[in-house]
């Protein structure tokens, strides 16, 4: 199948906007969504990301004007090669950590390379999150859409070129991409191989967190989110369309590219964001603030302040707190924390937590800085210093995350993780304050 592999990439700026884009002049109807005859002989199609009657501020929908409607496809058949999945592991309250997963030796495209790590909901439920690590070494020739949830991609190695129905975006490590539920896309590897993390959000679409007393600016600013402009493929020839439905891959063969949207308008859009543009907030007096100040995106629940999923980062930042234990404090949390590392080192773990690795601390699992970090922090000269060349992140969720059977049985699971706290001494002396 022939396709344009090098369009000029342009983006629209903003978050939650009503965007509009057309690859041909006049392709968008004026004053209505579904005219009797759409410009250029296109078909009008609505892609809904939320229910019709949601509050307008929460509504996500986009009108597509395409060469062929999505309904033009044969029957989907279950693929013989299914993604790694199956049952979650048994109940396990232990703290878990994994070394980086290897890039596969055999040819593996983006959708073949998902390793399930943890989940807290079945795909048919309108809440919860499933977490994966992806490892790939070849570009996709087929096209994919995920009926189970919204996808948040966090590259750790290798740039991705993501061709979506609405346009093309390139995403590199230290950037993230979000693809709405049901949107068709293809991932091409610009560096030959790639590895990273995926949060599959089954709940409310991701949005910016409220800023509260921070005010009207700070954290991830809306103007730094980028949505691709319209770009279409007018191609004849066989192409496989794969959908993920209730955790399984089903496919059909089309005789055209399904990435054939010539124009579109709406708010249900793919986007990318450069984590280096995050406006980090921290203390300028004492104590380590709660990690919620590092929230980039959140998927809320019906309980105010309780997240279905938060995406939190730990970026480069200045540490200036006086008379303060500066690393993240020891903690037992109502929330469940899955952490990854994009580059550098995490300031609470001196050893063992590597880029491409991961950790899971479940509800009420005691965690905090390891023994080496703790010892250094207590004795440190509290001059201002910058934590630099680092980017850790966390998928945090209010529902218990259960590790997958594959994650519990893979050789990258560190059996000795608990030992990083084993040498924490008792320094208590009742006779010396």
From Swiss-Prot:
Pathway listed: Amino-acid degradation; L-phenylalanine degradation; acetoacetate and fumarate from L-phenylalanine: step 4/6
Any one annotated GO CC term: cytoplasm
Active site: 288
Cysteine pairs bridged by disulfides in the record: none
Keywords from the UniProt entry: Dioxygenase, Iron, Metal-binding, Oxidoreductase, Phenylalanine catabolism, Tyrosine catabolism
Record EC number: 1.13.11.5
Residues bound to Fe cation: 331, 337, 367
Subunit: Hexamer; dimer of trimers.
Binding sites annotated in the UniProt record for homogentisate: 346, 367
Molecular function as annotated in GO: homogentisate 1,2-dioxygenase activity; iron ion binding
Name the record gives this protein: Homogentisate 1,2-dioxygenase
Family note: Belongs to the homogentisate dioxygenase family.
Lineage of origin: Bacteria, Pseudomonadati, Pseudomonadota, Gammaproteobacteria, Pseudomonadales
Keyword Transport: no
UniProt gene name: hmgA
């Amino acid at each position: 199948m022939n396709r344009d592999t090098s369009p000029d990439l342009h983006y629209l700026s903003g978050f939650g906007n009503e965007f509009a884009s057309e690859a041909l002049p006049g392709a968008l109807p004026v004053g209505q969504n579904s005219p009797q005859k759409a410009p250029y002989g296109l078909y009008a199609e609505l892609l809904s990301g939320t229910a019709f009657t949601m509050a307008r501020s929460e509504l996500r929908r986009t009108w597509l004007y395409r060469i062929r409607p999505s309904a033009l496809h044969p029957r989907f058949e279950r693929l013989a090669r299914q993604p790694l999945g199956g049952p979650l592991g048994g109940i396990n309250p232990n703290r878990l950590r994994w070394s980086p997963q290897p890039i596969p030796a055999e040819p593996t495209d983006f959708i073949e390379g998902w390793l399930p790590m943890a989940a807290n909901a079945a795909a048919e439920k309108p809440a919860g999150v499933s977490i994966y690590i992806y490892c790939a070494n070849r570009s996709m020739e087929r096209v994919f859409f995920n009926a189970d949830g919204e996808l948040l991609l966090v590259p750790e190695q290798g740039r991705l070129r993501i061709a979506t129905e609405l346009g093309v975006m390139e995403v590199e490590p230290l950037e993230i991409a979000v693809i709405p539920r049901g949107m068709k896309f293809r991932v091409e590897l610009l560096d030959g191989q790639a590895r990273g993390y995926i949060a599959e959000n089954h709940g409310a679409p991701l949005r910016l967190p409220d800023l509260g007393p921070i005010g009207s600016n700070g954290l991830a600013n809306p103007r730094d989110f980028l949505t691709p402009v319209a770009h279409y493929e007018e191609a004849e020839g066989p192409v496989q369309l794969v959908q993920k439905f209730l955790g399984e891959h089903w496919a059909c063969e089309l005789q055209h590219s399904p990435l054939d949207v010539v124009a579109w308008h709406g708010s249900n859009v793919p986007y990318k964001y450069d984590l280096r543009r995050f406006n980090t907030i921290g203390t300028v007096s004492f104590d380590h603030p709660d990690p919620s100040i590092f929230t980039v995106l959140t998927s809320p629940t019906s309980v105010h302040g309780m997240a279905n999923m938060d995406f939190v980062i730990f970026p480069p930042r200045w540490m200036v707190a006086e008379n303060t234990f500066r690393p993240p404090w020891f903690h037992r949390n109502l929330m469940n924390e899955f952490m990854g590392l994009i580059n550098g080192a995490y300031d609470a773990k001196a050893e063992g937590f590597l880029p491409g690795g991961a950790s899971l601390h479940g509800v009420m699992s005691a965690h905090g800085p390891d023994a080496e970090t703790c010892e250094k922090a207590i004795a440190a000269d509290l001059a201002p210093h910058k934590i630099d060349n680092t980017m850790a992140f966390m998928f945090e969720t209010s529902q218990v995350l259960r590790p997958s059977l594959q994650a519990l049985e893979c050789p990258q699971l560190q059996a000795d993780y608990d030992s990083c706290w084993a040498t924490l001494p008792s320094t208590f002396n009742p006779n010396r304050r």
